[in-house]
Amino acid sequence: IMIDMKKILILPLLLFFLIQGSMAQTPKWVEKAKRAVFSVVTYDKNDKMLNTGNGFFVSEDGLALSDYTLFKGAERAVVITSEGKQMPVSLILGANDMYDVIKFRVAITEKKVPALIVAKTAPAVGADAWMLPYSTQKSIACVTGKVKEVSKVAGEYHYYTLGMQMKDKMVSCPVMNAEG
């Protein structure tokens, strides 16, 4: 009976340390940064739902990015923040079908929204990268990976090839570096 008791006590302790170890790997900036990621819902001319996906704010005044495919054929679009607030997309500022990216303005309902800061320099090949998914939950599971390749697009923008396993619903979620 004493051996069985040791096994019973060791298992919960082992699970506790495994959970603590996995939580420690999530960068500190995740809690703040996840509030900048939102869900996008687009509607057709009959006000029927067309597509859903993700996007994120890149400025506190409502400038945002998402994938262009979501907006094709849409009459209007709404973003839903991680807190559940709905805000309409008010203006399309630019789109690129080849790279499947769209830049737009959201009619924010607050003074400012949480935004991600675009990195000034490209990460090195082999650098750690985190995919920050949209989540309404308190805890968030980032997907980690490495930068496999960095190339230039249009002379000034960087295009990254990443080594990470993503789910379909992670399209248009931001990729973060070690600094967040």
Please place each PLM-identified region on the residue numbering.
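N-terminal activation segment of mature serine protease catalytic domains
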Residues: M23-F57, L63-D67, R76, V101
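Positively charged n-region of N-terminal signal peptides that target proteins for export
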Residues: M2-I8
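Conserved hydrophobic positions within beta-strands
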Residues: G55-F57, V89-I92, V147, V175
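Conserved active-site neighborhood of the chymotrypsin/trypsin-like protease fold
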Residues: S59-A141, E156-Y159, K169-M170
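Short, intrinsically disordered, charge-balanced linker/junction segments flanking boundaries
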Residues: M2, M23-A24, V89, M176-G180
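Sec-dependent N-terminal signal peptides
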Residues: I8-I19
